[in-house]
């Protein structure tokens, strides 16, 4: 069957007429995906350098993950937590080992993991630290992105995410990201946690100053405050490490994981911490019908197996090698249509010279050349290809960006 642009128009019309208008996607309608590539309904091929905002760290339809899903689909997919299932225990144990923690609270989406982590932190504050009832406070960072639930957008500094959704949940203090002095000033006797991303993804891949995460750890230790690291985007290989926080030589008290944990196949997230933190939860105080379901846990176990390979041919090592190529190649463009490049591992934020056009315009031009990226905050675009991308494919993406910039100059 020969596909034409009419197929794209039809799909876009259906979405426009029947879906809420809460996204502004690029004019590409994907029909298939394999590895680092996708094919649209017209039959055109694209190198996926967004990877589902890092949900597809292992590429589209990784054979090990698809096989795990198929095996579980033939057995049982959902039990709820009213009963046990034979995938939940092994998944929690294996994730605890990989992260160096003792306990796991399985959920579904990244925002659920964040909300669950906030609840746990407050409860820990009341029951363990001894904060008076209803006075717990949590410090967060300006520019951070942790999801779009009502509590989370309440402490967002993004006017689009926040506007029109008040009144908001109280108990949050916002400080500049990377500013240890401001963080120290914000921590008081009722502070129970500091929540931050070790690398701010949605903000444009903002890497904190050297020593910042270690400084956060020290402040939390001094004040008996939980360090909660939102690794929903940064974790599970994106920075070349299992955990970006650990890559900086720091251990958080609580890790929030999601996106790639489900292999790009099923939603799966988790709160990971030691017993002295997650032990504050008792039956009936928190739950999720789908959290810890056998299908998600089976896929999650296959993801953990991929990450457990720390050898030179494993996913983490491959991501570091490809990431070094990406950072070096993008760095050459600074001063040639690019104002700045920030990044770590296989993850980069590129600030395009705003005189050449918006990040959206550059993203659309790249799509026409067969490369998918996404813009954020004006003239910034993000690169986060799957860890299975090759060096030649990385070069293809950066060459395409260079060609687009040349055309715009």
Please report, for each region that a protein language model flagged, where it lies by residue.
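Conserved N-terminal phosphate-binding loop of PLP-dependent enzymes in the Aspartate aminotransferase
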Residues: 2-409
